[in-house]
Amino acid sequence: MEAAVKEEISLEDEAVDKNIFRDCNKIAFYRRQKQWLSKKSTYQALLDSVTTDEDSTRFQIINEASKVPLLAEIYGIEGNIFRLKINEETPLKPRFEVPDVLTSKPSTVRLISCSGDTGSLILADGKGDLKCHITANPFKVDLVSEEEVVISINSLGQLYFEHLQILHKQRAAKENEEETSVDTSQENQEDLGLWEEKFGKFVDIKANGPSSIGLDFSLHGFEHLYGIPQHAESHQLKNTGDGDAYRLYNLDVYGYQIYDKMGIYGSVPYLLAHKLGRTIGIFWLNASETLVEINTEPAVEYTLTQMGPVAAKQKVRSRTHVHWMSESGIIDVFLLTGPTPSDVFKQYSHLTGTQAMPPLFSLGYHQCRWNYEDEQDVKAVDAGFDEHDIPYDAMWLDIEHTEGKRYFTWDKNRFPNPKRMQELLRSKKRKLVVISDPHIKIDPDYSVYVKAKDQGFFVKNQEGEDFEGVCWPGLSSYLDFTNPKVREWYSSLFAFPVYQGSTDILFLWNDMNEPSVFRGPEQTMQKNAIHHGNWEHRELHNIYGFYHQMATAEGLIKRSKGKERPFVLTRSFFAGSQKYGAVWTGDNTAEWSNLKISIPMLLTLSITGISFCGADIGGFIGNPETELLVRWYQAGAYQPFFRGHATMNTKRREPWLFGEEHTRLIREAIRERYGLLPYWYSLFYHAHVASQPVMRPLWVEFPDELKTFDMEDEYMLGSALLVHPVTEPKATTVDVFLPGSNEVWYDYKTFAHWEGGCTVKIPVALDTIPVFQRGGSVIPIKTTVGKSTGWMTESSYGLRVALSTKGSSVGELYLDDGHSFQYLHQKQFLHRKFSFCSSVLINSFADQRGHYPSKCVVEKILVLGFRKEPSSVTTHSSDGKDQPVAFTYCAKTSILSLEKLSLNIATDWEVRII
């Protein structure tokens, strides 16, 4: 039986025909809402029902056709956030509200009711800066800032709410017809998918009938929108037509098409909009299948017809309409009012949490393949990195390392002594990452399956039996991670006595957790499967992978008794997944177009909270040409998560297999990454404590520069580095836009400099990575690169001081032990600030709460843009001692180099240039 199952399941089960995925017009709730929207809005607010308390203002909304009352709640939340919830006032049964995503119950501010016109209500926050203008009939909400309308809700009358009904088809059809004015005659029942929906050979039986919701938002003056990952699409969201909405529905799409709005592995229902002077966000907290339509009306100027000799002209601001539609749940939306990009990032993280602080090793290079065959293969690949002087930090094992795809086991023939293998890696100060998927092989001799089944821990089918689907092990059941008891039990499986063969250098990779179900509808789980609390899968599909990663991260923390930071990579994700680890872009292809699309995909993830993200180097599917592989390593070295990976039917592609010259180029790219690790680690600390993305679109750093608003071929790392990867074959030049008319930019390798506010044609050879340091920044680097991050903890630092046009610079360094939670619990960290002004470089505390002893020294300082040759340079330490410093100066390049220094990184000191 085992052999037969293995023959049945192959790569082709995942490499499915794209026709098995639905487009919008094949989705019943989309068709229903689009059909209804041709009608006039029938919702009005009953302002005589208004009640207000410390938390919220509540009032009824009535559908004039069905007379079914809805309850609207408006909350003011600390930090300039408004929340709108709309639910049935008395539903037949509770409707699903997404739990566990918000870090806590948001802190509210009391809204003050102001007098409005007849038929309207005005609510203001305590400061009076923001106001909600509520119009009764038809129901509409305007969010006003400084007397300017920023967002209008339901201005197009697209509020849609299907109330729950009894399971009696004729009555249900009649009531739904009254509510929505949709033709629900018998011949139209099947097309509208009210009580059952057919797609291919699958029939989705809907026990609660239709339950979809929808609402429109008009963003005044905004034409540039971003967010709502995950799609293999441009960074700036595009206008959509009928049947062309952005789909948020987590799916296993092997070799996904690019520039396509179909949903792939993860969903973050969070959208940002930016214009000159303001950035805003809309967070639609719903975990069911969701579609988003976007339509921009450009600014127009028209003449008012009037009597008299002069016709007055009036300019109408552009506005963009965003229409959210979800299959089920309630309307629960947060409006983030900014006004700056940084403010919006903080507002969103206030709700969903910040990026988890990663262990330092995870910012190094990761080597993965489906699959490394056995312990000898792992040993040989590990030795290959040392032989070719290429640093790396983690070896990865895919599903073949297990016994027949039974997770938490080892193939005894291929990996007879996994602890010995891990001790080999430990001796090199490296780690091991293994895969653990959510499907559990149905096998009465597999202890994980038996224990989960005995305790009722699997997702159920409609009949209440364990749901069964096909995945890599063959017939499998799926753990119900929405159940807290399942998550607690699952996390216990990572304890060292339970997970035989594991050690404390073993970390985790969650894959196939959309969840992927081979031969299921759209390669996933039936929507009428049943979860904890008797909730249908349709209610929470997009949050399944979120819970899987949560449980895995908790397991790694528990095994160390709360002392060590976890590392967990997940393919599927939701809003808030940043709290638990990293995300990658899934099964990409070894094509230039996939290298190019990885940049906007990662930028979109980054601005929606998930800073720790990356794409498989070289493309997971197919065999990359050598030039493409080199360029991908160069791009990946400047992206947050840095992993090479390939599927099982590709040629081996370890970095030394492409000829000596290409090995050198890949080595240089990886070593550049390792040299910059102090800067990377400091950026992740800022993402963790201050909510600022590590990888940033240009518009985030230059919010008043229109040209940056739609750029996606270059980006910022933090505020100091601009990166423009080469993404075209046989390129000899790239056009790089250097923003900021008052900025100066320095080539990271050659130190050539340009004034900002212009496009520069940069020559590129195969060894060129176009990277530019922003004037006014100080970047900490390591002066030597070791075999892994573990070999570099005590190596010396260098500082790259790039002067601004005013001759000043500032930068930071964050340092801790790189692996534990002591930085959080015991304040064992070092946070230093470097500032250069008036020819003096000062090292001082950025945060005096932290203390972390370090013997590391600053050995070299490079000052770029120093305009005159010094007569002397001295260091001044906190004990009052002055020491002369040897220096070299190049008048042609304006570079001042200070070497052979020994300035302790943890103490205050100054470098004085005279």
UniProtKB/Swiss-Prot annotation:
It comes from the Eukaryota. InterPro entries: Gal_mutarotase_sf_dom (IPR011013), Glyco_hydro_31_AS (IPR030458), Glyco_hydro_31_C (IPR048395), Glyco_hydro_31_N_dom (IPR025887), Glyco_hydro_31_TIM (IPR000322), Glyco_hydro_b (IPR013780), Glycoside_hydrolase_SF (IPR017853). GO terms for molecular function: alpha-1,4-glucosidase activity; carbohydrate binding. Pfam families: Gal_mutarotas_2, Glyco_hydro_31_2nd, Glyco_hydro_31_3rd. The keyword Hydrolase applies. The active site is at D511 (nucleophile), E514, D587 (proton donor). It catalyses: Hydrolysis of terminal, non-reducing (1->4)-linked alpha-D-glucose residues with release of alpha-D-glucose. Coiled coil: none annotated. One of its GO terms (biological process) is carbohydrate metabolic process. Keywords: Glycosidase, Hydrolase. Transmembrane segments: none annotated. PROSITE patterns: GLYCOSYL_HYDROL_F31_1. Its EC number is 3.2.1.20. Belongs to the glycosyl hydrolase 31 family. Has alpha-glucosidase activity. This is Neutral alpha-glucosidase C.
